[in-house]
């Protein structure tokens, strides 16, 4: 599909400096000054209203803002290959419906190659979405400038170009909305190797999206020598998810302090990390645990917290010997 949209050709339409739309008094002045014949004036008003309607409904600033927010969210999502029998719809897969034997039938080398194809397809799709959204922004700016022209005559003279531009922008919007949903992966080669008399199942590959894992910045807090971390996923999966939590001390000052780091598997959305150094900055990252079907994960959330200062020297026992020990406990909250 060609997403190129031709320009409006505003260079052929002379625009004066922008000003506000004609109000009722200015309309009467325009008619009194005989800028246009009455019928031509009515045509101008009808066409300008149609253009205004398009810009306030199909291409409104609020709608474009929502699309930009969705685009930013897609850049943070994780993308997976879903293997489905042809009679199942995307989202129906679970251990009961999709037996693990399906993976046992698939050639591992071919599947790894398809994961690379899936990653490339996802990257291209995100780039195309960004390009389409940029075209929508630019198109709205062009049409806004045309509406602000104080002289109706060039507007009427260039109406054919305006109509073409409206059709082009509608097509761009349709393409953008269609591409927001990950599509099917096209298989050039059989994924299932020859297994003799065994009946080969009919399968298809789809790209699916999982919402990003993000820290709860209000609930994640640092104490003197420990932190309480919380995170969430906007849309919870039907099956409980596993996460990978990483932490490290920023700007360690000794070799022993370099041991203040770790990778922790977590089966919940909350965790406490203890035996940290007081009055120091730590960086934390969270993501889903590695999955065999993951093809692209461009982003992971990170959070920096600063532990509170400890008591004055001499009032607390020495922490020597504890620097390399990083006891971690799941949160009870």
Swiss-Prot record:
It comes from the Eukaryota. Residues 307-333 are annotated as: Disordered. It holds the Pfam family DUF5581. Residues 212-310 form the Fibronectin type-III domain. This is Fibronectin type III domain-containing protein 11.
